[in-house]
Structures are given as structure tokens and as C-alpha cells.
Design a protein with these regions (language model features):
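Conserved beta-strand-loop-short alpha-helix elements that form
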Residues: 2, 102-112
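Regulatory sensory and allosteric helical modules in signal-transduction proteins
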Residues: 49, 71-86
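Short helix/loop capping segments that flank catalytic or ligand/cofactor-binding pockets
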Residues: 15-16, 49-51, 86-88, 113-115
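Short acidic (Asp/Glu) patches
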Residues: 54-66, 79-100, 120-124
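Fold-independent oxyanion-binding glycine-rich loops
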Residues: 7-10, 79-82, 107
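Active-site-proximal cofactor/substrate-binding loop regions of enzyme domains
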Residues: 39, 65, 69
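Extreme N-terminus nucleophile/cap motif
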Residues: 1-59, 76
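Short histidine
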Residues: 111-133
């Protein structure tokens, strides 16, 4: 399963001071959760600000280091991906996902996915952009 981290702050801050010295331990997990990462930042007013993703493990990604230290925000979702067996290692499968002004991520796999498709409106199914959302 993937590793997920989220935070909300009363003042804009970057991931590094919010998580503190244990951030390096979290990033080290990407040696095992090596199929990329994703981060969405948000504002309490206005919703999702931006999303950054990379297929490189966070521990090797200069982009992850930049996002963690230089993107102040009052909330973020962070995802380290360990791809489920049989699912593509593809940037489109790296969470967090965005729908409108909502960002979300999940952990785990439902197989077969077709077993729950009847629970989702057809217009939403048509908007899927990856094989994991």
C-alpha cells in the first residue's frame, strides 16, 4: 500500500517545518514506495492551488525537495506510490487526484473495479483519467 500524509495549518507553511525532522523518515519510505509521488496544495479559500507529481522516488526527486521546502500552503496532501500488482507505473496513476476544487487520494485496490462501477454516476466514470481513480 502507498504512504499518505496530509496536513492543515492555520498559517501557510511548507511541508518541511510542518512535519519536522521526521520528514526525512517519511521520504526514506520512497525507497520501498518507489513508483513516484504526488503533492497537492490547497488554500482555505479557493480550494486546490496546484499539484506536482513525479515518477522518481521522492528520495531521488529534486522536484519533491523543492515542493517540500518552498511551497507554503495552509494544507497539503502527499502520496508516495507503491503500485498495486498489475497497475501501470504511469504519472496519471500518481495521487492526489483532482476533481474540480477537490483533491483526494486513497489507499488500496478494489478488484475487479467493475464490481463497483454501478455505484458511480456515468458522467463521473467518463471523467476518469487514470486506471487507479
Amino acid at each position: 500500500m502507498c504512504r499518505l500524509l496530509a496536513y492543515a495549518s492555520s498559517e501557510p507553511a511548507t511541508l518541511a517545518p510542518i512535519v519536522g525532522p521526521t520528514l526525512s523518515d517519511f521520504v526514506e519510505l520512497s525507497k520501498e514506495h518507489k513508483h513516484g509521488w504526488g503533492v497537492t496544495t490547497c488554500a482555505s479559500i479557493g480550494g486546490v492551488q496546484e499539484r506536482e507529481r513525479d515518477l522518481a522516488p521522492a528520495v531521488e526527486s529534486t522536484l519533491f525537495a523543492e515542493v517540500a521546502s518552498s511551497k507554503p500552503t495552509d494544507g497539503a496532501l502527499v502520496h508516495l506510490r507503491l503500485a498495486s500488482k498489475g497497475l501501470a507505473v504511469d504519472l496519471s496513476n500518481n495521487h492526489p487526484f483532482i476533481h474540480g476544487d477537490i483533491s483526494f487520494m486513497h489507499n488500496g485496490t478494489i478488484r475487479p473495479a467493475s464490481s463497483i462501477e454501478h455505484l458511480v454516476d456515468a458522467d463521473l466514470l467518463a471523467q476518469l483519467t487514470s486506471s487507479t481513480d
